[in-house]
Amino acid sequence: MTITFFTGPAPLEAIRERLAAVVAANPWLAGRLVRGKGEKRTRLTFDPAGPLRDGLFTVASPGQYKVQGVSYAAIQKVMKGSPLEVQGGLKAVNTDAVQMNVAVIPDGDRWALTVSISHTIADGYTYYQIYSMLSASAEVKSLSPVRKESFSAGLGGAVGKAESKLYYSVGFFLNCVASMVFGGAVRSRCHLVDPAKVEAAKAAAKEDGDSAFVSTNDLLTAAWAKLTRAELLEMPINLRNRLPGIGDADAGNYEWAVFYQEEDFLRPGQIRKSLATPGKYMRCGRDPPRPLRSGGRLVRASYALITNWATFAQGLDLPGCEQQLHFPCFDLAAVPCEMAFVFRATGAETGVLMLSCKLRDADLAGSVFGATVDPVIFPGN
């Protein structure tokens, strides 16, 4: 789920018409999750005619949702459990629950747009493909919801056999539970990425000799791992065009993660090098890579995650208004580790949302992170 703030009058009919066109081209967005007796997998069923059914588009009443001029925690409190936050997973199976909601929240001469799509039917790439189609200047495209079985078949070979199963291990589950129960209060920070600091860091990284080129994402990933003192770092990657038969027109969940340990993110070039071999995406601090922790060592490992949405996102072009700020919404009570979201805060600026129990303001000194995205939404940054 994301929220985007605008100034100017909300173009309600333009958004409604645009959403109707997007759903007509992608009727699976109006679908329902079902599972029959004895079935092992959940299915998405939908009307190919793609009607804009109830619950897909919401216009809030004035004052119904207070999201302007309040903190990130207050925004999350308003969103949590509301009709604007769609429910995926088992809670939505064999119900009439929508898997997508687009909502306009008016507030005088300004307004906010929330877009929520269930992670059951969409990963970050799919989300932003749909989100970007709401723009008046964007092309409305049809994406295929048909599951490509080549993903499961090729996953272990691409990211490692043990790595492809880590999410399902008892140790990983207990690590997340322990963090949520005993980790302490989660604090939200959000900073812009400083372009000048990034360029200086890229120049320095070239001297390391790991790679002739490092991206901004490489820098941010290595920086986040060090800031959080991670022993296990997860970086989701989009596997479209990296696994056979899966391309840009495929909707659904086609991402997995590269997992790193302490020796694998000492330098930004190591992140770049881990993605450099087509068809094989693996940490490279040692050759061969050190096996991932397991059992009690995995339970106790300091676990962090960083995911990059900025490469998928574009600003929204809507008639009669101007976009001011965009950022992800994540339930602070559901944070399983030290999390960072890289996203497109404005048309030209990249932001990083940090959800952390451990991070201190002093830790950010000397990093590539600059000013806070917004001092009201993220006070004390």
Can you describe what each PLM-predicted range is?
Residues 116-117, 130, 219, 223-224:
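Short, hydrophobic/aromatic alpha-helical segments in well-folded domains
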